[in-house]
């Protein structure tokens, strides 16, 4: 039984407004092969960066509430700790203001992210001065802050120096849409990922069984292209991704990889095998599937997947279509 998935192009991919002004799912089949149509990508990759500059160091003015709470820094009482962390809330985004902490001339704080978008203090409308608040920085070093993913179930309390690193890999952080491309901005808990795919990405075909054939059509399309298919077996769902991109100037390559709709710990229970077979030739790749928490971008960047160029693809292709045998096994 064969299902087809046709090519399509991938479309390219505010702090408080008042403050700124003052500054899978498709058909489920029981067949053994599915056809994935291409999604062409017109967007490039981008990176963002930021910088912060430390201004004048002074014994900064602090509000009376800050002063009255300083003696409690480092205390063990949970309620008092919560009171202290509330002093660090940014009045614009309600995230925490962490060192280096800058204040306005009246002692009001705002986080670095929002500060870059403002022309005046969101609290008093006074000028934003580059004044370091050393007293609040000292308090911050003795306070434990909740993980920003606490709403998703994380119970960690962290000193500010460990907060960013923890949050980047927190197991409770929301899952992003696993589909290639930057057009879908959905994020949410793991148990809603499949529901999202079924509702918002209905063109993706799902095949049942641990052995299937992933048939990518029109592999000779120019530009950046991707093919996606779902595979369901062992009570889990796997997403098969084939991307064609120009990783080096003038040299297009194919990257094939499998990711589990699940956590990294769950992914450790499986191994996947990709095989190109035909014309008395065979090309194989075997590895642990990626968790969708990790995504596939870093694996593709590091070539930690099945990689082959367009000339190799032509050795296995039939009239512009490429079949990849996919096998999922329990470890």
Swiss-Prot record:
Its main location: cytoplasm. A zinc finger (SIAH-type) spans 142-202. Component of some E3 complex at least composed of sina, ebi and phyl. Interacts with eff. Residues 34-72 have a biased composition (Low complexity). It catalyses: S-ubiquitinyl-[E2 ubiquitin-conjugating enzyme]-L-cysteine + [acceptor protein]-L-lysine = [E2 ubiquitin-conjugating enzyme]-L-cysteine + N(6)-ubiquitinyl-[acceptor protein]-L-lysine. Residues 32-72 are annotated as: Disordered. It is found in: Cytoplasm; Nucleus. This is E3 ubiquitin-protein ligase sina. A zinc finger (RING-type) spans 90-125. Keywords: Cytoplasm, Developmental protein, Metal-binding, Nucleus, Sensory transduction, Transferase, Ubl conjugation pathway, Vision, Zinc, Zinc-finger. The lineage of its organism: Eukaryota, Metazoa, Ecdysozoa, Arthropoda, Hexapoda. Belongs to the SINA (Seven in absentia) family. Residues 139-331 are annotated as: SBD. GO terms for cellular component: cytosol; nucleus; ubiquitin ligase complex. One of its GO terms (molecular function) is zinc ion binding. GO terms for biological process: enteroendocrine cell differentiation; positive regulation of proteasomal ubiquitin-dependent protein catabolic process; proteasome-mediated ubiquitin-dependent protein catabolic process; protein ubiquitination; regulation of R7 cell differentiation; sensory organ development; sevenless signaling pathway; ubiquitin-dependent protein catabolic process. It holds the Pfam family Sina_ZnF. It is an enzyme of class 2 (transferase). Its EC number is 2.3.2.27. The RING-type zinc finger domain is essential for ubiquitin ligase activity. Zn(2+) 2 binds at residues 177, 184, 196, 201. E3 ubiquitin-protein ligase that is required for specification of R7 photoreceptor cell fate in the eye by mediating the ubiquitination and subsequent proteasomal degradation of Tramtrack (ttk). E3 Ubiquitin ligases accept ubiquitin from an E2 ubiquitin-conjugating enzyme in the form of a thioester and then directly transfers the ubiquitin to targeted substrates. Zn(2+) 1 binds at residues 147, 154, 166, 170. Pathway: Protein modification; protein ubiquitination. It comes from the Eukaryota.
């Amino acid at each position: 039984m064969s299902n087809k998935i046709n090519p399509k192009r991938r479309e390219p991919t505010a702090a408080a407004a008042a403050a700124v002004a003052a500054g899978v799912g498709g058909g489920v089949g029981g067949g053994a092969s599915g056809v994935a149509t291409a999604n062409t990508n017109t967007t490039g990759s981008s990176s963002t960066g930021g910088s912060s500059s430390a201004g004048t160091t002074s014994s900064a003015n602090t509000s009376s509430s800050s002063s009255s709470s300083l003696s409690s820094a480092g205390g063990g009482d949970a309620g008092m700790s919560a009171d202290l962390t509330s002093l660090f809330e940014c009045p614009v985004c309600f995230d925490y203001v962490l060192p280096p902490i800058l204040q306005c001339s009246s002692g009001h704080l705002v986080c670095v992210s929002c500060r870059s978008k403002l022309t005046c203090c969101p609290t008093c409308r006074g000028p934003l001065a580059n004044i370091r608040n050393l007293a609040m920085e000292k308090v911050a070093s003795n306070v434990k802050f909740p993980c920003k993913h606490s709403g998703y179930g994380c119970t960690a309390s962290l000193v500010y120096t460990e907060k960013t690193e923890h949050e980047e890999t927190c197991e409770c952080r929301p899952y992003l849409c696993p589909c290639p491309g930057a057009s879908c901005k959905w994020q949410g808990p793991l148990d809603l990922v499949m529901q999202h795919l079924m509702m918002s990405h209905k063109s993706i075909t799902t095949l049942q069984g641990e052995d299937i054939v992933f048939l990518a059509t029109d592999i000779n399309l120019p530009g950046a292209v991707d093919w996606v298919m779902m595979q369901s077996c062992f009570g889990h769902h796997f997403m098969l991704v084939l991307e064609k991109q120009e990783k080096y100037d003038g040299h297009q390559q194919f990257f094939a990889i499998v990711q589990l709709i699940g956590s990294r710990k769950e992914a450790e229970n499986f191994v996947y095998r990709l095989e190109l077979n035909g014309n008395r030739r065979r090309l194989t790749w075997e590895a642990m599937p990626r968790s969708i928490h990790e995504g596939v971008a870093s694996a593709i960047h590091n070539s930690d997947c099945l990689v082959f160029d367009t000339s190799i693809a032509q050795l296995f292709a039939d009239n512009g279509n490429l079949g990849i045998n996919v096998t999922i096994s329990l470890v």
